[in-house]
Amino acid sequence: MLPELSAIQAEMQQQGLRRLLVLSGDHNWCHQQAHELQQEFMGDWLWISYRKEKAVLPEKAAGLLGQEYLHGVFDATEGLNAEALAILAGTLKAGSWLVMMVPSWHQWNDQPDRDSIRWNEQSGAIPTPNFIQHIQRQIANDRQVLLWRQNDPFYIPELPQYREWQLPDGQPTAHQHTILARLLRANQGVWVIIAPRGRGKSTLAGMLIQQWQGHCWLTAPAKATTEVVRCYSSEKGQFWAVDNLLKYCRQNSVSDIDWLLIDEAAAIPTPQLFELISYFPRILLTTTVQGYEGTGRGFLHKFCAEIPGCHILNLTEPMRWAESDPLENWLEEALLFDDAVPANHSAKAIGYHVYQQQQWIQQPELLKQFYGILTSAHYKTSPLDLRRLLDAKGMQFVAALGNNTLIGALWMVEEGGLSAELAHEIWAGRRRPRGNLVAQSLAAHSGLPQAAVLKSQRISRVAVQVNRRRQGIAQGMIAFQRERAEEQGMDFISVSFGYTAELWALWQKCGFQLVRIGTHLEASSGCYTAMAIFPLSQQGIALCVQAQQQLARDAYWLESQIGFSLPVDDQADQRLNQNDWQELAGFAFAHRPLSASLPALQRLLLNCGLPLTALRNHLQREMSIEQCVTELRLNGHKALTLLWRQETAQALVSLDEKLAMYWQEWTTVFSEANRLHHPICH
């Protein structure tokens, strides 16, 4: 076995190729074969594994971006983290083996996958038969993948020959030289270099900094990923963390800076990108729009398309390995990185179809189209979404088809149906089980525990082919699914999104009602989280009415935090009502967070004459947490929160001792005694 692999290894070095070798069997056997390969072939042999000592854990693999290694081992015997697999492949140099250890071939389907704990809505690891069948098919169908199964003869197929490959000498390629010349002549504008991994976009950015006769700054989601840029720039350009750069630009002139280079731009929230490009005369953004950071072609359609005169440049020729690299080709097929969707210009009637997860495996072309549309529309789509799509529990899928071609995709997630006892604990801040994003959030943050008991479906993703947008297709899919959800006995359907006036107008057009706005910016979108629902049952309508009334009542205090007006009618009445007492009791006697209780606490301060120094310092005098801790000589944030809760309890007792005692008991546990006034029961 080893002499044959040695001959293949020598050819890989000469031809600039990387290959996948799959070891399938029990863990000890796989580990032994991988160890023998490591002894035979000199190299870095980076391991990603849950089990091997000193290996990189799959969830820590992102820290490897921007680095290079010779040979790697990916241990998938306990679970297959698809992003980590792609990241490891992206770090491997020409001539590398990627050795993937997997369970016994015929038992792999039935084995619980540890990675499913990350993305399945339910607790505990589950088998993932659909994804495993998909991966097994890709391994078996690719004649350039070597598969060695325990207790079976190791058959090495005849491999095609490639011409000899020359390692880049550090000078720009002809294509890089052409782009670099254009950039060096630029007077102003936004330039975007788009390329898959290994094409030299970071190298090109570094060359621009090195050759530019002026000042260049560099930013990226993480400094570690800019190692190549800084290497080729001779460390000339100053690096800034995104948040620090924005803070500096808001307070200082940057007119003497000629270029801002933004590496891995698609991983930065678009509002931050739009603000950054407003400060500098020349901007260069480099990014990949296919791959493991969850950066799809939505970056082109949603960001680049909104910039007048944006110059989009592409690098296609690989620099770190040869053209038609077997490992890259296999990975693109296995993780569906090629998101090209067949164009459909037909104006014929559109039909809506429901699909089950098993059909993705039975019709792989359908899977490719459905996932491709999601990737083209959402530039945060990643291999984790592919795993959810294939095997996560409680998923429903609708597709819009025109002329037998898929032109729209809708992905729903089942939520709610929790017990009254668990919903009460979620409301009280004592429990936060996995899943149920909107249903739990309405209970935990909006004070609506009944939302977690009612049955609902959440829109996880909705996407339409680029050339068929603004034709009512998304609206049609949602209306189709809304009817299905009503037939299935759902109480409401929901959606969570980063709030912008434009996005809210879209959901409002689909009939949704705004029920919640968060007060912390989302890392992914740079916007505040908004939640909206479309009620389907009488209980759903009652929930919607109560949620809207509460949002309108809290709007004044929420708007002061988020800095813009909400599309609701503010209520001027600041007297305490029953909902306020319930909320304040949850803060004083349970574990509801300050952010959820803040509007009720502000009303409490207006209606109570007690000093309540800790609360007033933070909420009325707007002292920071650090200032409050120092002023009151407390031992940190936890001590301050405890004091806030004690002051709230003191205020409630001072207003009505009997009522305060009732609500204290009410918060303790859901029981027959508190059913009368419990929103879960109404």
Curated annotation (Swiss-Prot):
InterPro entries: Acyl_CoA_acyltransferase (IPR016181), GNAT_dom (IPR000182), NAT10/TcmA_helicase (IPR007807), P-loop_NTPase (IPR027417), TmcA/NAT10/Kre33 (IPR032672), TmcA_C_sf (IPR038321), TmcA_N (IPR013562), TmcA_tRNA_bind (IPR033442). It is found in: Cytoplasm. It is an enzyme of class 2 (transferase). Its EC number is 2.3.1.193. GO terms for molecular function: 18S rRNA cytidine N-acetyltransferase activity; ATP binding; tRNA binding; tRNA N4-acetyltransferase activity. ATP binds at residues 176, 198-207, 320. Residues 357-534 form the N-acetyltransferase domain. Transmembrane segments: none annotated. GO terms for cellular component: cytoplasm. It catalyses: cytidine(34) in elongator tRNA(Met) + acetyl-CoA + ATP + H2O = N(4)-acetylcytidine(34) in elongator tRNA(Met) + ADP + phosphate + CoA + H(+). GO terms for biological process: rRNA acetylation involved in maturation of SSU-rRNA; tRNA acetylation; tRNA wobble cytosine modification. The keyword tRNA processing applies. Acetyl-CoA binds at residues 462-464, 502. Keywords: Acyltransferase, ATP-binding, Cytoplasm, Nucleotide-binding, RNA-binding, Transferase, tRNA processing, tRNA-binding. Catalyzes the formation of N(4)-acetylcytidine (ac(4)C) at the wobble position of tRNA(Met), by using acetyl-CoA as an acetyl donor and ATP (or GTP). HAMAP family: tRNA_acetyltr_TmcA (MF_01886). Belongs to the RNA cytidine acetyltransferase family. TmcA subfamily. This is tRNA(Met) cytidine acetyltransferase TmcA. It comes from Photorhabdus asymbiotica subsp. asymbiotica (strain ATCC 43949 / 3105-77) (Xenorhabdus luminescens (strain 2)). The gene is tmcA.
